[in-house]
Amino acid sequence: MTDPHAPALRHGYFGPQGTFTQMALASWLTADDATLAAARPFGTVALALDAVRAGEVDRVMVPIENSVEGGVSATLDALNSDDPLVIQGEVLVPITFVLAAPRGTDRAAIRGVGSHSHAWPQVRGWMAANLPSASYVPTLSTAAAAEALAGLGEKRPPYEAAVCAPMAAEVFGLEVLADDIGDNRSAVTRFVVVSRPGTVPPPSGADKTTVVIYQHDDHPGGLLELLEQFAARGINMTRLESRPTGQAMGSYCFSIDFEGHVADERVGETLMGLRRVCADVRFLGSYRRADGRPVEATRTTTDEAYADARAWLQSLRD
Ligand SMILES: O=C(O)C(=O)C[C@]1(C(=O)O)C=C[C@@H](O)C=C1
């Protein structure tokens, strides 16, 4: 049970208002949390994560993975640098884009379109078919593109329209010139709630764990060695990406999500295996998966199977 006298957690998100990330936070907050209006927007993912590290807020919502464009590098890299952070939970948000502009804008007058770098590739086909001569102008977020058009920014932006969420068009009083312009109508983005390390949510039976792994050196079979740790314990991976470490050309780490909770025996054994064969393993949290799908262990990888094997080994040693 939550303590009714405990202060509400202070939340932040990758903003400004009207981002898909704010929508993710709205669906995450419960009646016990402070309201969405009290949540602080941060203009970049790195600023949002730094605010948690500095203790300015307790939790922030950031995008991590899109079903069309893949991993959000800014988040993967910022989660992985500086002081440790952990993921407390995840949210899935269906992504619907609109083309929005100040009221009265003539579509024929649009020369530039502003949006986030992860949004643009998701509307590329629509743009090529409908606004082939418009050039793309990158902005910090989809909502930042809309906000600047509304004249709230310091100066006029170098574009006439924005690709953003319907909510951003509404918040910043823009006119929707075209609805539902995503090339893939079933696009979904996954967002994560991040805090400083301290508590790990209890196992729910439908959990995921995120780690970043650094290998000792570049050698034949290095990746296989690492994958074997998962395969041998019947663990399903749900995302695997290599990211440059930035230390030297060809130096990569692996960012991995897999099914199970750090409290599960098979997950513990896998983490120990990784720790043995790799130079470093950064634990980024165990949390309930957004779709709530239960994680099934195979007959040979249940907690009971591990406990039985451990008891047997102990009896031999005794
Ligand atoms: O710019 C926003 O509105 C965001 O919340 C970021 C973000 C992302 O980084 O993927 C979220 C969902 C969309 O796929 C496009 C942009």
Predicted segments, located by residue:
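Domain-level signature for soluble enzymes in the chorismate/prephenate branch of the shikimate pathway
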Residues: M1-D318
